Swiss-Prot record:
Name of the protein this chain belongs to: DNA ligase
Residue positions binding NAD(+): 31-35, 80-81, 110, 133, 170, 285, 309
EC annotation from Swiss-Prot or TrEMBL: 6.5.1.2
Principal EC category: ligase
Listed GO MF terms: DNA binding; DNA ligase (NAD+) activity; metal ion binding
Role noted for this protein: DNA ligase that catalyzes the formation of phosphodiester linkages between 5'-phosphoryl and 3'-hydroxyl groups in double-stranded DNA using NAD as a coenzyme and as the energy source for the reaction. It is essential for DNA replication and repair of damaged DNA.
Gene this protein is translated from: ligA
NCBIfam families: dnlj (TIGR00575), PRK07956.1 (NF005932)
Organism for this UniProt entry: Bacteroides fragilis (strain YCH46)
Active-site residues from the entry: 112
Binding site for Zn(2+): 403, 406, 421, 427
Cofactor: Mg(2+); Mn(2+)
Assigned protein family: Belongs to the NAD-dependent DNA ligase family. LigA subfamily.
Length: 665
């Protein structure tokens, strides 16, 4: 046997043993025997790099190379499902499907696993790409990290799979792994993960795949897409996918009647507590792919599927005290400190009280027995008080009047429930919160910096605001606690690299109230530089797509503050991209000036976001709904029948991709 043949043999053996252990849960060899085979393969691959294969089992161990994720457009948009919490709405969904199809249909009921969504692409039986849901149009390429998940096959079994296809599913962190990870974080005095979903999502986005490999993520796959799929049945296709090596949930049922659907829901509403992974509902899908196509999509979700969410679990425990947290915007949040209680698979010690009105409405007293719920929320919340056991009335909980961090008198804006600390330039949590937001991945994305490092730099007087980051040198931070030469160099390198971050993300990084990622993009496309934005009036801001008076006034208030203007000037001096690059400004025309355009369907040549950019680049305006003022509809495949009917009724022109591209060329 040649070396190459031996390597191939070991790879096949290890792929099979991975499948036996992680998917079938039926190992045929011991862990030691598996490790010995893996070590033998690693040695041979190291000695013979000419036989390197990206899909080798050895690629699952992860790498400590730190790199940014690239964004990849989804071939098929990853839409979210419509949610329902009532059986009446499930009945309405069933009736809508029956009326629209006017023929027999089956509903496939599946567990709704509570993790992070993933889309896997396979070509010729090999995993070539793994992409997160992102915004539904495009997501992060996390292929290297996903390759560390043992239940996801790198190479498929058999040979009857399509040449190219996508399969989607949920990346999960089992309860046992989640609890062990939080015990480790607690021992290191690090912030705990709130739930397995956050832990799985956070792990998948780590830029060190060796750590990802150590976190023992799992995956269930639940939807197959592509041409030449085995059958017209969604359920049947998943059974075929299981034969190819995918981990498909056995907790599925094809239902012929609505009563069978409810039987499935009611059974798992009780039994889900015994599962080793988090679930939060049941997904209902029309089983026939042909019928799915006939039903089509709305702008946000498929008409052939719905998610029934389980009611939040609740528990009774004692309220010991109320503490207060100050966020980066100055919002003060009351937090209930409780006797530990088991809820939804985790031990709950704290719960949000949200604001003064909630506290007053609950008539809370220290020592009360309170009901705690945990639904989709990250932090549990108190929903009621058991006054029947209030024998000894403790001190009534009253919302504080002054900031717990800096002592400033709190204010409450008209029409808002929250109280705020107005001392935004000298209140420590606000300053640190603004810096943490500034360095975050979706903002300036500064590698090596995190909350602990920011806290240390702030305590030592090295930074007082975001602009101070750009004055730091390696000598300033070398030798600090857990800060060696390499760590110091990486942080300074990350800070310098952030100067290349585009205008829209710098706007988002400023932390202007109500200005999220989407609004920041709209602003960046509407002004050539920060000076134009600083000097914009209310009318100019309101005329920007998706910006109302509330956001516009927040922007005006931000730049009316002299401290903020000085900060922006210092960031500009530091070299940040507070302007649109020349290439962005070139190519603009007025070919679509004055036209309001609706985008609908799935596209081939560009993504929906790219078409929105093209519309704005040529002077047009993107609008979300059809009205008599709509100029035309840019339509791709699977345009919703409701939009089609409304466009026809109003006599609005429908334009395909080719016609649109010709129009703007």
């Amino acid at each position: 046997m040649t070396v190459k043949e031996k390597i191939e043999q070991l790879r096949l053996q290890l792929h099979q043993h991975n499948y036996n252990y992680y998917v079938l849960n039926a190992p045929e060899i011991s862990d030691k025997e598996f490790d010995d085979l893996m070590r033998e393969l690693q040695d041979l691959e190291q000695e013979h790099p000419e036989y390197k294969d990206e899909n080798s089992p050895t690629m699952r161990v992860g790498s400590d190379i730190n790199k940014n994720f690239t964004q990849v457009a989804h071939k098929y948009p990853m839409l979210s499902l419509s949610n329902t919490y009532s059986e009446n709405e499930v009945t309405d969904f069933y009736d809508r499907v029956r009326k629209a199809l006017n023929e027999d249909f089956e509903i496939c009921c599946e567990m709704k696993y509570d993790g992070t969504s993933i889309s896997l692409t396979y070509e010729n039986g090999k995993l070539i790409r793994a992409v997160t849901r992102g915004d539904g149009e495009k997501g992060d390429d996390v292929t290297d990290n996903v390759k560390t998940i043992r239940s996801i096959p790198l190479v498929l079994h058999g040979d009857n799979y399509p040449e190219v296809f996508e399969i989607r599913g949920e990346i999960l962190m089992p309860w046992e792994v989640f609890e062990a990870l939080n015990r480790e974080k607690e021992a290191r005095e690090e912030p705990l993960f709130a739930n397995p979903r956050n832990a799985a999502s956070g792990t998948l986005k780590l830029q060190n795949s060796a750590i990802v490999a150590s976190r023992k993520l799992d995956a269930y796959l639940y939807y197959l897409l592509g041409d030449n799929l085995p059958t017209d049945g969604h359920y049947e296709n998943l059974q075929e996918a299981a034969k190819w090596g995918f981990k498909i949930s056995p907790l599925m049922r094809k239902c012929q009647t609505l009563q069978e659907v409810f039987d499935f829901i009611n059974y798992w509403d009780v039994e889900r507590k015994n599962l080793n992974v988090a679930t939060d509902g049941i997904v209902l899908k029309v089983n026939s792919l042909k019928q799915q196509r006939n039903l089509g999509f709305t702008a946000k979700s498929p008409r052939w599927a719905i998610a029934y969410k389980f009611q939040a679990e609740r528990a009774l425990t004692r309220l010991n005290m109320v503490t207060y947290q100050v966020g980066r915007t100055g919002a003060v949040t009351p937090v209930a400190n409780l006797d530990p209680v088991q809820l939804s698979g985790t031990v709950v010690k704290r719960a949000s009280l949200h604001n003064a009105d909630i506290i007053e409405g609950l008539d809370l007293h220290i020592g009360d027995m309170v009901y705690v719920e945990k639904g989709g929320e990250i932090i549990p919340k108190i929903t009621g008080v058991d006054t029947s056991v209030r024998f000894m009335i403790g001190e009534k909980v009253k919302f504080i009047t002054h900031c717990p961090e800096c002592g400033s008198k709190l204010i409450r804006y008209e029409g808002e429930a929250a109280h705020y600390c107005p001392n935004e330039t000298a209140c420590p949590p606000q300053i640190k919160g603004k810096i943490e937001h500034f360095i975050s991945r979706k903002a300036m994305n500064i590698d090596g910096l995190g909350p602990e490092t920011v806290d240390m730099f702030y305590r030592l007087g090295l930074i007082h605001d975001t602009a101070d980051l750009y004055r730091l040198t390696t000598d300033d931070i070398r030798g600090l606690d857990r800060m060696g030469d390499k760590s110091a160099e990486n942080i300074i390198k990350g800070i310098m690299q952030s100067k290349e971050v585009p205008f829209e993300r710098v706007i988002f990084a400023l932390g202007i109230r109500f200005v999220g990622e989407t609004v920041a993009k709209k602003i960046a496309k509407s002004f050539k530089d920060i000076e134009e934005l600083e000097n914009a009036d209310l009318e100019t801001l309101i005329n920007i797509d998706e910006i109302g008076e509330k956001i516009a006034r927040s922007i005006l208030n931000y730049f009316a503050n002299e401290s903020n203007r000085k900060l922006v000037d210092r960031l500009k001096t530091a070299g940040l991209q507070l302007y649109r690059p020349e290439e962005d400004l070139s190519g603009h025309t007025d070919k679509l000036a004055g036209q309001s355009i609706v985008i609908s369907g799935v596209f081939t040549h560009h993504s929906r976001d790219e078409y929105k950019d093209l519309i704005e680049k040529h002077g047009g305006k993107n609008v979300g709904s059809i009205s008599s003022k709509t100029s035309f509809i840019l339509a791709g495949d699977n345009m919703g029948p409701a939009k089609l009917e409304k466009a026809s009724k109003l006599g609005i022109k429908i334009m395909n991709e080719e016609e649109f591209l010709k129009l703007i060329s």
